[in-house]
Amino acid sequence: MSATKKTYSSTTSAKSKHSVRVAQTTADAALEAVYEMSGDSGDSFDYSKSVGQSAESVPAGAVTAYLQRMQREGLIQNFGCMVAVEEPNFCVIAYSENASEFLDLIPQAVPSMGEMDVLGIGTDIRTLFTPSSSAALEKAAATQDISLLNPITVHCRRSGKPLYAIAHRIDIGIVIDFEAVKMIDVPVSAAAGALQSHKLAARAITRLQALPGGDIELLCDTIVEEVRELTGYDRVMAFKFHEDEHGEVVAEIRRMDLEPYMGLHYPATDIPQASRFLLMKNRVRLIADCYASPVKLIQDPDIRQPVSLAGSTLRAPHGCHAQYMGNMGSIASLVMAVIINDNEEYSRGAIQRGRKLWGLVVCQHTSPRTVPFPLRSVCEFLMQVFGMQLNLHVELAAQLREKHILRTQTLLCDMLLRDAPIGIVSQTPNIMDLVKCDGAALYYGKRVWLLGTTPTENQIKEIADWLLEHHNDSTGLSTDSLADANYPGAHLLGDAVCGMAAAKITAKDFLFWFRSHTATEVKWGGAKHDPDEKDDGRKMHPRSSFKAFLEVVNKRSPPWEDVEMDAIHSLQLILRGSFRDIADSDTKTMIHARLNDLKLQGVEERNALANEMSRVLETAAAPILAVDSRGMINAWNAKIAQVTGLPVEEAMHCSLTKDLVLDESVVVVERLLSLALQGEEEQNVEIKLKTFGTQTTERAVILIVNACCSRDASDFVVGVFFVGQDVTEQRMFMDRFTRIQGGEKTTVQDPHPLMRPSFDGDEFGRTFKRNSALGGLKDHATGSVERLDLYLRRAEECMEVMETIPSPKFNNKQCQYLAGKLKAVLQSASLFLRISHHEHHELGASIDMGRHVEIFKLLLALAKEIESFIQGCCKDEWIKAAMTLTNVSEYVSSMGFNLELCKIAFCKSCAASGSLTLDQIEVICKDEAEVVKRNASIDVDTLFAKVIYDLTEKTLSSDQNDLAIYLLQRLKRAKPILPSFSSRPSWWNFYDDWSFSEKFFQWIQITGSLGSGSSATVEKAVWLGTPVAKKTFYGRNNEDFKREVEILAELCHPNITSMFCSPLYRRKCSIIMELMDGDLLALMQRRLDRNEDHDSPPFSILEVVDIILQTSEGMNYLHEKGIIHRDLKSMNILVKSVKVTKSEIGYVHVKVADFGLSKTKDSSTRYSNQTWNRGTNRWMAPEVINLGYESTEGEISFDGKVPKYPLKSDVYSFGMVCYEVLTGDVPFPEEKNPNNVKRMVLEGVRPDLPAHCPIELKALITDCWNQDPLKRPSFAVICQKLKYLKYLLMTGFSSYQDSYPSTEEPS
């Protein structure tokens, strides 16, 4: 069915869609009539042929009868019975023939006369059920919406048989469907029904809400998986209805032996409009057995028409549909409606206003199957959630598509300003980028410019002539079938050109977009040719549907969507304004020529000229106005009345400067008037006029005007008239460019010390527009920056969305905060990647690998922080999908560890040391690089580590110290992925290799002391050119040293301190670790010292949650590895990049450290009585203090035996750390005696949490402090709760309202 439109308004588009549905209903009725005439068996019914002929005219009466038959056929399915009753007396007015048997009214033995129950017209149905069941029915009938209480559990009075009663109201009473309650079902009461549905659907809903935004395909795949798990059907599919009402299978999960239907397209008649209407009212449709004989209804003869079964759960399938199911081997089905918002202005009725049927989720089974009503209610609830999630995805996709179109329009407009009109077809992007199409053309001045797949130039001219002849009254035309639009030359265009959108830009010029026929885009995995297939397309079957669909869409393109037509219309307006310049110029030339000929003699001649001038002014395509010597309007043509919304009669005698001009243009207009009245005419001056009437909500009207003097017969100036050009649309787009350029200029020129380095490049890759943060970096060639530019472009789009469109839960300040952090990440990426490319081109330049590593680490940390925040805080918001489109951490990680980049680094390092030539290193890396090129599935990180690993082995035994230093540094960073290699040299754990360690130790330079503890001292040092921390243990065979080295060697996490190496020199055990800025306790102390109010806490609540969240993530990683820390406290938590200012909020990087007392959970070694409970009493769990041990049942016993350390003791310590971060003080600060602290802990005493602690956090800490370790949450649970709390704080839904962190440095 073709869709041909002559206008682009949304209302007309909605009406057109309504017309399509009406026409489709007619086609449904025609197809049904053909089926009915084929006989009961339907053997003579040719499905494929009938679909093609169903569009023929059908009498209105036949359509009405068809719709009535669909709703009032008087047949139900036999897995239940139906009774219709009057209100309020419950007298039966209709019932199904099987009702007596189903309700156990037919006794097994002959009853006495007093015991016989009778069901007939007029029977009070309450007498057939127990008193409690009757009361339940009466209570349900008294409610306004009876369906909210479904199912109502009732029991037959005679047998006590339990039944589900599903009730709904119709025009003449209440229809009650009765279904059997199976023994495996768990009957739920009316009050508990909704709650039970929520519980059963909870897992599926959680999974749906956790999906990333913007991926409709993944969302559909997930819903079919969850529905199949709930219902157990053989096949579950998700159908989507397209704009032309045809359907497509977009997701499928099936039994392996069933034929796939994924990708199947089927004609709109396969699911009639009447069935779709019924699904909007009754959103879950069950067919238990398509072969079962339907049951007839018996109704009161006084009722004038059959009882409506539109809302009945038992309505029988129509014969045509039942045969279709049987042909495809689907005996039973469960169909669920997927309904989303419909923003179209035009609607068919109140029931459907604002909502539309997006598609269906369809379950099919190869044998009879009945799903109990409570489970169907669960599915219906799940579909509601799915519809809400889908609506968010659809709206996001529409926003992104509109944003892309707007950006393209902006660029096209800019091209017009520079090269009109040819720039929109000769430059990039062009008009093909505006909407999805296969080709486009510009027909202007009888010349043709072609792009992509289009008709020939002569055919374009013929189409233009046809439009001017048959559609000259419209501004454009869109159709998915030129043949159906009655274009006579359509058969000459072939399959390559079927659909067309045309926009008239002048009286005789057009823009065209073309599309090929739909079949070129349609693929179905099941549509394979089978020589043995006997189905010739006559019978109803998915294969026949697919064939019929291809026949229907033959010579037809995909339809033009409203958003695409809006984009075309917008461009049309811009172009018409641009082309109007020529007409305006002609008008101005004509007017000036007439004015210069005022030397004409004779009154009659002058009057004729005046009349002609009035006609020219009134009919001119340009806005024209005139004023007298006082500035009062005395001429106001139709065009300016149109653009301002002010009618001529209201404009006359208004003051131009006081009533019509915006304040910002008053001075300009007054100057123009003054000069013109003195005889001096100005040209090309911009003025802004007010808007009136229906135009008041729009922007000001911007005109470029020429001021012309109006003279009388004596040649005196008596007034001024203005000939203008409307440039409002162009100025809107130029203002958008100006704002973007202004932001870019601020970034480049802003001298703020916190501004990150940024620069841009020209078409040759040279740097320009550097800001002060880039310092004295010289211009250099950056190599290929296409990927980086794409990355930045995508991110800028995201930031524009965030900064300009307020979220329902995020205010503008919060969005700008996130956008600022993302911009910092991107600028760091720009610096890192461009410098790397620069050094690639200048191999002789000296390098600072430490700088590269630090920039990359900072970049990756910030990127992951933003991405993690988005995942945790924006579950159901468009903002999550918009930001995750940038794939920040994935992109940065892949670029940071790119093999090519690392290979260049090896070459530069070796060249600097002079130990190996570049050619030698190239040979070493070449094979690995070729493997990556041949097989992209190989993990680049692993390959990178392998290359370093091999190079290190080649250099350790030589005198190539510089290369060895560099390679060891890189190798230690890559070490966590190396254990997968089968062989490792002895020097790997080189703290056991004295000869090498002694040589290695010479590379460490001590620069200062950091502190000391009971088992080790920590010094500040420089190792391999990088500042590090050197931890030296007391004693030669220190168990703490070996334990810590063994644990650190297996750890790799952003919230766990990293070990570079562990050299042993002169029997001194040492660990070389990353250098941090200090511990958490010292940071809190510095914060408290700086606070003017010494009673205020050291951190804001948002910082508190961020710090303990990072700590919990590090501890969760340890526990997943089976490692117990045993000494978790603020002194053993290190921080990085801290300045002790408010601007650091959200940037405190936390890492868990000090593993000297740590132990693996599964270790068979038990601690000695002297060492097992080492730690600090204030942070010790009660079971640790009490010398408990883990029994085989997992419980803690306190009898003094030597213990295994319980895992949940770390959770208790974590609770104490939370107290520290909240208050800035140690636990139990008033108590100085350690023994008293132990006693208090064992008695269940805990520190008092401060008043500013949010309720959610207070509950979590209390759980961590629980006396019973088995009742404490795991760190995995703690992480989830803290992420959610962070979300609540950021969105303002927490019990605590903290100020949002400032991104400005305090003065």
Swiss-Prot record:
GO BP of this protein: detection of visible light; regulation of DNA-templated transcription
Among InterPro entries, the record links this protein to: GAF, GAF-like_dom_sf, Kinase-like_dom_sf, PAS, PAS-assoc_C, PAS-like_dom_sf, PAS_2, PAS_fold
User: What is the annotated signal peptide range for this record?
Assistant: none
Q: Which GO terms describe its cellular component?
A: plasma membrane
Processing after translation: Contains one covalently linked phytochromobilin chromophore.
Entry similarity comment? In the N-terminal section; belongs to the phytochrome family. In the C-terminal section; belongs to the protein kinase superfamily. Ser/Thr protein kinase family.
Q: What is this protein called?
A: Light-sensor Protein kinase
